[in-house]
């Protein structure tokens, strides 16, 4: 008799294929679920593989459009950067994947969900917090945290032997000496030879971006139009190409940014579970959009509002990274950020060239930039004499600080 029905987040790779068979060995019926979030994957082959391994059903879900609109766009509005550098490509994808996983579980009457995330990483937290937030009654089977599983499979060699024994198709190409995770927003690389933070990334590691040294000698000049803080159109200023749907916009910017080697970073970051890890990331389209959004936002947003919004962006980044997308605090922050974008509207022109994004100009019907007010040639409503009082008022605390420091110094010299 079956122990119950499990929806497995299935990739078609060695790990989750072995997990699928292992779950069946444990007495579960398994539904294999594959999320298309823009990775390079032959989904028909993966479907046939899952069916051959005994999956009761296989669901392949195209989540690319909702990934862009419901996850990438809110992160862009917030200028979300974890620890000032990481654009959160993996972190944003996990709640998108897990949300559909629990939807399938609820629809199919499954009591369990399962994933192949390791017991040392962030993804286990992100998957499971999403599952519990959206389907509180669900039970999670995390094989890499179950002693019977991880003691049995201590490495790739054990998985390969298990696969051979159970007629699981195995990769015919040598495994790269690092792990890789890809989606529409980015590709991440970690583990293996990259675990030594001193090791340079091999030149053949990068798949989404060209080496800037070998990128075209001719820049691509683009215009990106924003409304309420999200891009609604991107146009090439020379060849006339224009994209308007969210998915088309993002894919096109990935193409242009990747061609010029934009968006590569190599960092050591702080995982939520307490350890530091090294990650190498390629995020071409996201990097182009971040620079454009920063520019139009500063152009149209009040200074003090933006200061508050910046602090919310930092908190939002931490919540995303740590797996709290569907928490009440993250919902609150998203709503605040969305409200801040009400007047973030206009066009930014930029150049993409050899690993860099150069802002060329901007215009907006809701700009707070007053050319006459700021001009050195026109006095306008601003009286330069008023600056004297402004400076004196701001100097009061500096003078008081100096007085205190002087008194302390005098006592020290006695």
Swiss-Prot record:
Belongs to the argininosuccinate synthase family. This is Argininosuccinate synthase. One of its GO terms (cellular component) is cytoplasm. Pathway: Amino-acid biosynthesis; L-arginine biosynthesis; L-arginine from L-ornithine and carbamoyl phosphate: step 2/3; Nitrogen metabolism; urea cycle; (N(omega)-L-arginino)succinate from L-aspartate and L-citrulline: step 1/1. Its main location: cytoplasm. One of the enzymes of the urea cycle, the metabolic pathway transforming neurotoxic amonia produced by protein catabolism into inocuous urea in the liver of ureotelic animals. Catalyzes the formation of arginosuccinate from aspartate, citrulline and ATP and together with ASL it is responsible for the biosynthesis of arginine in most body tissues. It comes from the Eukaryota. Keywords: Amino-acid biosynthesis, Arginine biosynthesis, ATP-binding, Cytoplasm, Ligase, Nucleotide-binding, Phosphoprotein, Urea cycle. It comes from Danio rerio. L-aspartate binds at residues 118, 122-123. CDD domains: ASS. ATP binds at residues 9-17, 35, 114-122. It catalyses: L-citrulline + L-aspartate + ATP = 2-(N(omega)-L-arginino)succinate + AMP + diphosphate + H(+). PROSITE patterns: ARGININOSUCCIN_SYN_1 (PS00564), ARGININOSUCCIN_SYN_2 (PS00565). The gene is ass1. It is found in: Cytoplasm, Cytosol. GO terms for biological process: argininosuccinate metabolic process; L-arginine biosynthetic process; urea cycle. Its EC number is 6.3.4.5.
